[in-house]
Swiss-Prot record:
Any one biological process term the GO annotation gives: L-leucine biosynthetic process
Occurrences of domain Pyruvate carboxyltransferase (ranges): 33-307
Localization: Cytoplasm
Positions of the UniProt region annotated as Regulatory domain: 439-557
Co-factor requirement: Mg(2+)
Protein name: 2-isopropylmalate synthase
Family: Belongs to the alpha-IPM synthase/homocitrate synthase family. LeuA type 2 subfamily.
Example GO molecular function: 2-isopropylmalate synthase activity
Presence of keyword Magnesium: yes
Reaction catalysis annotation: 3-methyl-2-oxobutanoate + acetyl-CoA + H2O = (2S)-2-isopropylmalate + CoA + H(+)
Species this protein is from: Pseudomonas putida (strain GB-1)
Binding-site positions, Mg(2+): 42, 246, 248, 282
Main location: cytoplasm
Length: 557
């Protein structure tokens, strides 16, 4: 089957909203919305392999550290795992006083009862009710008319009141989502929400949340903004309602839809870090927050260590962040074009500490989010002839990890600037050897012994230290590398590890690459090459460790 010559026979444009006096186009966002992360619920349910409890707790702690104050933790009635996770958060004291747990439930009494039971003992909680309201869901999925769909919402809302009253020690906030809101007739969406409001009887002092999802993105962002402005004008008791947005990215405009929705009067935004979620993902909270930041608005979220946050998200979701992803991708602060590089160089030369940021091609100062300037201008001395990475792969079988490519290209650029000449493949390899493989001070690996004990690795290494001293370090861990890190006298965090074979047969060698941080410093890479893969990995660690310590010493001097 191929694309239709006349797609109007199969698809139709979404109807516009009659709102000739719309005001949102002339407004600007002046403050951060209330943020709600749905990573542990909407994000988790979209993963090929959902997170286990350990990963969920790690993710929860990261969200708290970043500063997210409302976190949708799970769907407690969906599984015992989700129920138990909520209990763990409450019973083990993982919910700070300024943070509110949110959970989701469908509109059935047994599920609602189970949901409230999961929250027993919580100081405060948001309980989130939803049912779909759009024509296609009414007709195709539920076989219900409008009254039937409205009754589902109203009856469930009454059950919320009933079960909340049984746990008066908790400060409850109720949230209702007319799922598929953006594909629902506005008058009917308002009718259902007004009916729920009537049951919950909110006040300006104790508000409810009405969450208005673009469950599937069906129109351009301006139409969604019109829907939000129309709804904000017409919903009952607006002063007692928090209007929340929940955008997906099916048309690639989830960020724009959310920003226009905030301009149209919304108070709150739900989403996921780096845009994980069903299909094309939920709106990306990181991009939303940093878009505000680069407009001079405090986003109320802290991404000072954006690479550390990305590491947690990638490991928990088991999904990579795209190298072109806004703000956090490996390549977003990198210029390959000569004219771009020239403009950036001139911008850095004129930029003064404390002045407004005006470096061309860089909408944010990379240092603000924990990035170094070294990756900004990546010079390829063999531009048009394959590049540094291509030459190393083709001539020497060395495949540098992406972030190390960025780091090493700066070393090459420094050498080409010094020589005033292009570098051959042999010269590039010699520079790699000198920079990484000969990084033997202050600690040089002499030998190592590895043993397996009760499923764990035990490592003892002999190290040549400064002043001809001999050191012996011992450590245990789940693998050889983890055991070595445990035995180091310095706090080291491994950010990334890669390995591959060089050549084949009896002459094959192993190459190992490590990215690590020493004592919370900036990430540094190391390389090790040896016939034995364990030895290669140890050499790579010492290479990175020595390079980091040398750089810290040089900076201190």
């Amino acid at each position: 089957m191929t694309m239709l010559k006349d797609p109007s026979k199969k698809y139709r444009a979404f109807p516009t909203i009659d709102l000739p006096d719309r005001t949102w186009p002339s407004k600007t966002i002046t403050e951060a919305p209330i943020w709600c992360s749905s990573d542990l619920r909407d994000g988790n349910q979209s993963l090929i392999e959902p997170m286990d409890s350990e990963k969920k707790l790690r993710f929860w702690k990261t969200l708290v550290q970043v500063g997210v104050k409302e976190i949708e933790a799970s769907f407690p009635s969906a599984s015992q795992t989700d129920f138990d996770f909520v209990r763990t958060l409450i019973q083990d004291g993982h919910i700070p006083d300024d943070t509110t747990i949110q959970v989701l439930t469908q509109a059935r009494e047994d599920l609602i009862a189970r949901t409230f039971e999961s929250l027993r003992g919580a100081k405060k909680a948001i309980v989130h009710l939803y049912n779909a309201t759009s024509p296609s869901f009414r007709r195709i999925v539920f076989n219900q008319d409008k009254q039937g769909v409205k009754d589902i919402a109203v009856n469930a809302a009454k059950l919320f009141v009933k079960y909340a009253a049984q746990q008066p020690e908790t400060h409850w906030t109720f949230q209702y989502s007319p799922e598929t809101f953006s594909a629902t007739e506005m008058e009917f969406a308002k009718e259902v929400c007004d009916a729920v409001i009537e049951v919950w009887n909110p006040t300006p002092e104790h508000k409810i949340i009405l969450n208005l999802p673009a469950t599937v993105e069906v129109s351009t962002p301006n139409i969604y903004a019109d829907q939000i402005e129309w709804f904000c004008r017409n919903v009952s008791r607006r002063d007692s309602v928090i209007i929340s947005l929940h955008c997906h990215n099916d048309r690639g405009t989830g960020i724009a839809a959310t920003e226009l929705g905030l301009m149209a009067g919304a108070d709150r935004a739900e989403g996921c870090l780096f845009g994980n979620g069903e299909r094309t993902g939920n709106v990306d909270l990181v991009t939303l927050a940093l878009n505000l930041y680069t407009q001079g608005i405090d986003p109320q979220l802290d991404f000072s260590d954006i690479d550390g946050v990305r590491k947690v998200v990638e490991e928990c979701n088991q999904l990579p962040v795209h190298p072109r992803h806004p703000y956090v991708g490996d390549l977003v602060h990198t210029a390959f074009s000569g004219s771009h590089q020239d403009a950036i160089r001139k911008g850095f030369a004129k930029q003064q500490e404390g002045e407004r940021w005006e470096v061309p091609y860089l909408p944010i100062d990379p240092a603000d989010i924990g990035r170094s300037y070294e990756a900004v201008i990546r010079v390829n001395s063999q531009s048009g002839k394959g590049g540094i990475t291509y030459l190393l792969e083709q001539e020497y079988g060395i495949s540098l990890p992406r972030r190390m490519q960025i780091e090493f290209s700066q070393v090459v650029q420094g050498e080409t600037d010094r020589l005033g000449l292009e570098m051959t493949a042999q010269q590039i390899y010699s520079l790699l050897h000198k920079e990484y493989l000969q990084a033997n001070a202050p600690y040089a690996l002499v030998s190592h012994r590895l043993q397996e004990e009760n499923g764990h690795s035990a490592v003892e290494v002999e190290v040549a230290g400064e002043g001809e001293t001999t050191l012996h370090w011992r450590g245990k861990g789940n693998g050889a590398l983890e055991a070595l890190v445990a035995g180091l006298p310095i706090a080291v965090e491994i950010m990334d590890y890669n390995e591959h074979a060089i050549g084949a047969g009896t002459n094959a060698k192993a190459a190992a690459y490590i990215e690590l941080r020493v004592a919370g410093g900036r990430p540094v890479h190391g390389v090790g090459i040896d016939e034995n893969i364990t030895t290669a990995s140890f050499k790579a660690l010492f290479s990175a460790l020595n390079r980091s310590l040398s750089q810290q010493e040089a900076k201190a001097a």
